[in-house]
Amino acid sequence: MLSSVRSRVLAVAAVVLCGSSCTVANSPSGDAGDAGSTLRVVLAQEPPTLEPCEASLTSTGVVVRSNISEPLLERDAGTGDLRPLLATAWRQTAPTTWTFDLRGGVTFHNGQPFTAQDAAFSIDRAVNSDLQCNVDGYVFDDEEKLGLEVNGDAGLTVHTTKPDPILPLRLSFVEMVPRATSTTAKVREPVGTGPYAIESWETGVSITLRRNENYWGEAPAFPAARYVWRSEPSVRAAMITRGEADLATTLNPEDATEENSVAYPNNETTALRLDGREAPLDDIRVRKAIGLAVDRDGIVGTLLAGLAEPAAQLIPDGVVGFNPTLKAAAYDPEAARALIREAAADGVPVDRKITLVARNTQFPRVAETAEALQYELAQVGLNVQIQMADTAAHLEYQLRPFPTGVGPIALLIMHGNQAGDAAFTTSQYLRAGGPQSTFGTPELDAKIAEAGGLAGPARQDAFAAIFADQNDSVAQYVHLAHMRGLLGISPSVRYQPDSATGDEMHLAAVRPAAAGEAR
C-alpha cells in the first residue's frame, strides 16, 4: 500500500493547505457580482475561447454549450438518450443518409431567424472546413466530409461516406451559429440561439451573460450570469462560504462541506499515457510494470479522499463499450520489479529518465498524485522526473503533433467521454494515428474501424473487446481512477449536477432557492 508515501504526501498536503488558507485570507477572491439577479459562477480557469466549434473542450464547453449556443439535439446525461433541441425529429432514411426536422420560431441573439441554411452552414464550418475545430477530429474523423442538403427552411439531410449509426449523437456536439459567421477564422465571442447571450468579456477578469428575452424555450430564472476564475480551489470554496459566488467548479475535498458543496459522478477517467515510441516505454514489459507499480486503492483513498474508484479502462460504466469484466490491476511491486529486471537483461535502458507531465489544476491534489506516482515507479527501478505544466503546455503533449526531442513521456491525462459512446474514445486515444494517441497496432485499428459501423449489442461487445485488447496487447495506458467531482453550491440556489456538469453547466437549470427550502 501507500504507507510510506502516504505520510510524505499528507505532510506536503498539510503545508499546501496552510498556505492555501493564508491565501484565502489575503487575496482578492470576490468580484463575482452582486447576489440576487445575477447568477455568480467561479471557474478554475478562464476559457481560452468561446468559439462554438471548440465547445467539446471542457474549458470552453462549460460556458458555451446550451448556454450561449445550442446543437440540433443533446444527450440526456441520466439516460443516455438523445432529446430534441433545435431539431424536433430525426430519422435514418438510407444507410448513409439522415434527415432532420428543425424547430421553427427560433432566432439568434442578433435577431436573425434560425433556418436549415444556418444548420447546414454550422455543420460545414465545424466539420468540413480547414478551421481545425476541436469537434473535427474529436467527434468526427478528420478525413470525413459530410454532404449537406437543405430542404426548405426546416429540413436538413446529411449524407455520410459510410454508414454511421451514431451520426445524430455526433451532431449533438456541433453548435449552431448564423451563416454570417466567419469561415476563415474562429470567433472569440459567438452569436447563438441559447438562453443567454454574451454581454461582455473583460479578458482576465470576467465574462458576463444576459438573458435572451427572445429565447424559444423556457426562460431561465436569472436575468444575468457572471463568470470569474480563481485557480486556487480553497479560494473558490471560500467564495461560496462568504456568499460571493453561487456555484464553484472543482473543489478540493479538504475545502468541501455538506453546507458548501455536493459530490457528483463525472465522465472523467485519469490515466498515464505512455509514449511507446521511446525507450524504455517502447517495451511492453516496462509499460505493464508501470501498471503493476501503481497503488490505485491508496491513491483513491488517500489523495482523492474516496471521491473516485480504481479504473481498468478509459471509460466509466454507462458508456457504450464499457467492459464490466475488466478489473483494475492489483498493486504488485514485486512483479513490476521482475518485469523491469527482465527488460534490463535484454538491453532495454530502464534507467533512462522518464518525464511525467501533469497539468496544474487538472484535478484536486494533482501535484501530490504525480509525486505518489513518481515515488511508486522509483520503487520498482524507474527514473521519473515530474514536469507540472499549464493548460497550453500540457496540450502540446496531449495533442498531435507531439513535441520532438523530449524523450520518453508519461502524460497524466483526464479523459471525459461526455458523448456516451466508446467510438469517441477509441478514435482519439487508441487508434495508432489518433489525435491523442502516441502509437497503436494495425490489428487494434482494424477492430476500431469495424466496431464503428456496428449498432446495438454487437457494437457494445466489439468496443468492450477493444478495451481488453488495449490492456493485453498494447498497454499504452495505465488507468488510475474513474473520478467524482465536487461542485461548490450556495444555499441560495438550487442545482442538481450530473455526469455532464464538468463539460457543460446549463445555467437554465439553476434557480433561486425558495424561502425555507431544504437542499
Where do the model's predicted regions map?
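Append "and occasionally in soluble cytosolic enzymes with long acidic Gly/Pro-rich linkers
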Residues: L281-Y375, A515-R519
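Ligand-site clamp/hinge motif
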Residues: T184, N212-A256, N383
